[in-house]
From Swiss-Prot:
Pfam families: TPR_1. The keyword Repeat applies. The keyword Repeat applies. GO terms for cellular component: chloroplast thylakoid membrane. Essential for the assembly of the photosystem I (PSI) complex. May act as a chaperone-like factor to guide the assembly of the PSI subunits. It comes from Psilotum nudum (Whisk fern). TPR repeats lie at residues 35-68, 72-105, 120-153. Belongs to the Ycf3 family. This is Photosystem I assembly protein Ycf3. GO terms for biological process: photosynthesis. It is found in: Plastid, Chloroplast thylakoid membrane. It is a peripheral membrane protein.
Length: 171
């Protein structure tokens, strides 16, 4: 039984019903419907912390989905799982792939910045201020791109850019 038919919470059930109605009304191919079902089941598993199951569903969706925009969200969600698992290098790869297909994903830029900032903090703890500055500069670059796409979001990042003197070419 597909995961979407096993949802226990109201929001997931509502989303599933709405998605099923849309799939019936909007003209789509069988392949597109199947890709969306895997994507939806992946999101459901991911929201419950079932990352292995979510990844399986996302990989199946990727094999079926041909639309670059839709693929960007699948790749982004795979990146989220790798971020949650602490696999930052892998997460960055998936965020890059998502942005190649859809350069208007501010959340991918934000997540890349967060990873770079984290690595900068790690470098400081390891007594390597030079490397930390490289990571912080990279974080600033990604946050500026996220903010350019969503100027009313990422307030903490905007403050960090100002406080650290990295906002000069952004504001």
């Amino acid at each position: 039984m597909p995961r979407s038919q096993r949802n226990d919470n109201f929001i997931d059930k509502t989303f599933t019903i709405a998605a099923d109605i849309l799939l019936r009304v909007i003209p789509t191919t069988r392949r597109e419907k199947e890709a969306f079902t895997y994507y939806r089941d992946g999101m459901s598993a991911q929201s419950e912390g079932e990352y292995a199951e979510a990844l399986q569903n996302y990989y199946k969706a990727m094999r079926l989905e041909i639309d670059p925009y839709d693929r960007s969200y699948i790749l982004y969600n795979i990146g989220l799982i790798h971020t949650s698992n602490g696999e930052h290098a892998k997460a960055l790869e998936y965020y890059f792939q998502a942005l190649e297909r859809n350069p208007s994903l501010p959340q991918a830029f934000n997540n890349m910045a967060v990873i770079c900032h984290y690595r900068g903090e790690q470098a400081i703890q390891q007594g390597d201020p030079g490397t930390s500055e490289i990571w912080f500069d990279k974080a600033a670059e990604y946050w500026k791109q996220a903010i350019a796409l969503a100027p009313n979001n990422y307030i903490e990042a905007q403050n960090w850019l100002r406080i650290t003197g990295r906002s000069e070419d952004w504001e």
